[in-house]
Amino acid sequence: MSGRWHSYSSYLKSTYGKPVYRIGLDGGFSCPNRDKDGRGGCAFCDGTGSVAQYQRSSESGFFRDSSYTDEVANSLLPRAQSLSAQADRAEAFLRRRYKAELFSVYFQAFTNTYAPVEELERLYRAALEAVPGAVELIISTRPDTLGDDVLALLSSLRTEERAVWVELGLQSSNDETLRRIGRGHSAACWEDAVRRAKEAGLKVSSHVILGLPGEGREDYVRTALFVDKAGVDGIKIHNLHIPGGSRLAEEYREGVLTAPGMERELEDTELVLRHLSPGIVIQRLLADTPFHRLMAPRDFPDKFIFLTRLEERMTAYGTRQGDLL
């Protein structure tokens, strides 16, 4: 661990000998929380999903249906071809901007295991063929869409040269919070998914959000300890972002919800880091929402300033990841 926390960049350099850059792909998946039952998705989601910067010109461009109909089956070929085009565009961008040499394939937008396993296999393999030599395959998904057949498929895609990661959204270990934000699963469901993924030989990371409605520092500590006990390999810690089209935006407009500013976020992030084992890779410390979609916080400083301030704060106080365990 270099610095005050086990950064993702240091993990990648120590594992692969040089920086690794993610190629974020949109496979045209949907989400069980946005399907025909009318739940409308998680309270913090505006319906556009998480799309990489270099793919954002085509946000929400896919037909998103979870049922395996002839229409979906027939769409697999153009979807696979789209993945190849996305990968080419992303790789060109990353090579030009960062002189990148090593890459991860990252299925990023929406719920990337929410489809029949035969559909998943075709799309995953198409993406890996589009990025030969990728050192990681990363699948972002929900714990309630991770069946044993999907885990077996993901395990089969591992090689000596390529790790397979599953990113499982948790957000909070408090079931009442999960109900309030409409996650549609429990903390126990997430815990079971982590256990089964680890048994399948996969690497697991999780997402948590600081600043959710009704939560405070005791909740953040409980969530950190819950994630730590589950044995995850990595974590993404997000500050609360309120997109304009989300249900949280309504609460914000009504004045019943605020988005934490930088000083509070610095304190809360430090507290969470101190309750995570030093071996857990810190893959992210801030959310990343396009500014034109963001209602709040609008005046939060950029990522570099935040990370610099966090490093300075933890150095000044002599704190580091895992020192309160």
Model feature map: region roles:
Residues 188-247, 263-285:
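Conserved C-terminal portion of the radical SAM core fold
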Residues 109-113, 143-145, 170-174, 208-214, ...:
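Active-site-proximal loop/turn and secondary-structure-junction residues that shape catalytic pockets
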Residues 176-187, 251-259:
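Glycine-rich tight-turn/loop motif centered on a GG-T
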Residues 21-25, 103-105, 137-139, 164-168, ...:
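Hydrophobic faces of well-ordered beta-strands that scaffold small-molecule active sites
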Residues 95-185, 192, 199:
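Conserved SAM/AdoMet-binding glycine-rich loop
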Residues 2-10, 18-21, 53-54, 234, ...:
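Auxiliary Fe-S-binding modules of radical SAM enzymes
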Residues 1-41, 46-104:
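N-terminal [4Fe-4S]-dependent radical SAM core
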Residues 84-91, 121-128, 151-155, 191-194, ...:
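Generic structural signal for well-ordered alpha-helices
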